[in-house]
Swiss-Prot record:
Glycans are attached at N95, N225, N259, N326. Pfam families: Serpin. It is found in: Secreted. Cortisol binds at Q253, E285, W392. This is Corticosteroid-binding globulin. One of its GO terms (cellular component) is extracellular space. Belongs to the serpin family. The record marks C249 as: Conserved cysteine within steroid binding domain. Residues 1-30 form the signal peptide. One of its GO terms (molecular function) is steroid binding. Proteolytic cleavage leads to an important conformation change. This reduces the affinity for steroids. Keywords: Glycoprotein, Lipid-binding, Secreted, Signal, Steroid-binding, Transport.
Amino acid sequence: MAWSTRTMMSLALYTCFLWLLTSGLKTVQSLHDSHRGLAPTNVDFAFNMYRHLSTLDPHKNILISPVSVSMALAMMSLVAVGSKKNQFFQDVGFNLTEISKEEIYQSFEKLSHLLSKADSSLEMRMGNTMFLDQSLNMRDSFLTDIEHYHESEALTTDFKDGADAREHINRHVETKTQGEITHVFSDQDSPAPLTLVNYNVLKGMWELPISPENTRDEDFHVSENSTVRVPMMFQSGVIGYLHDSEIPCQLVQMQYLKNGTTFFILPDEGQMDAVTAALHRDTVERWDKLLTKRLVNLYIPRVYMSGTYNLEDVLEGMGITGLFTNQTDFLDISQDPPQKASKIVHKVMLQLDEKDEPPVTTTEAPPQTTSEPLTLTFNKPFIIMMFDSFTWSSLLLGKIMNPA
């Protein structure tokens, strides 16, 4: 049976909530096992969004944080009202006769708390800030609901002066991300009287150190007719590797210390679209089973990259509606609704660079391999997937068309 994008999104969010509400006082191990079972449906929604963005501009870099998008959508459910509120909850898979709004909000607060407290060297600064026009007389119940979210807040600003509003928003997010994200809005962008900014900054410490001394400037082939010079990092070690016989690609699985894991997928020449079309949960499950440990000489570009998206436009393009768009939709949260509605901005920043740290001491014997080292060079467009193995959340999904 073929499932629509909307159905896949519903399953992803609903199963995530169901797990959180029933987890109770489970141990870390049972938490890990339970979330492993829920991960596939969450991956489906991420791939659907990724494929949609790919069709908009096949030659453009893509960088999204699926778990952050889910949190932003849940937060925006606070402001959808009337029939649109009901439609929105149906779109994301909720039955309000079986689960209350309070339980939904508490569930996402728990997930955010788990991600922020996970024992991992993956540095992540994730949050949501809602900026409200200071002329709005917001209902106390709405502001109280906003405070239910861990790492979420509601701030007022003057939207009459668009330049001042942009500066206020940009400065606040820059502070929250410790200078990593500096321009959520450019001079050409206009925030709405209710603007939600969802941000995620991702860095990490490799399990196997990458020395900056081995980094060299090398060619990266953006296309047949375009080549750029990029800092190419080098690492040699025993890692998970697969040359897929069905999908035209090679891939490696890299570990961050403790709970972070990343897949780097290198399509064969001219096969990016074919690999993108094949990205499904079954594909990831098959890769996980077929990966084998072997000695790899790996060359991969240093990456400092960001992605910015208007989520309302993206979701509308995916056929997902239900968020408010006009003045009457504000009546449930404000006594003085504005003429213009909302904007949801999703901003992601990724840093993949050298971390010349000593290896982690372990009592486990290293995997044995007798094969000759394989050389794999990511010198053309590739795909990256990043997960937190403690909560089994999809932290990042991206397509690197040009790392320069």
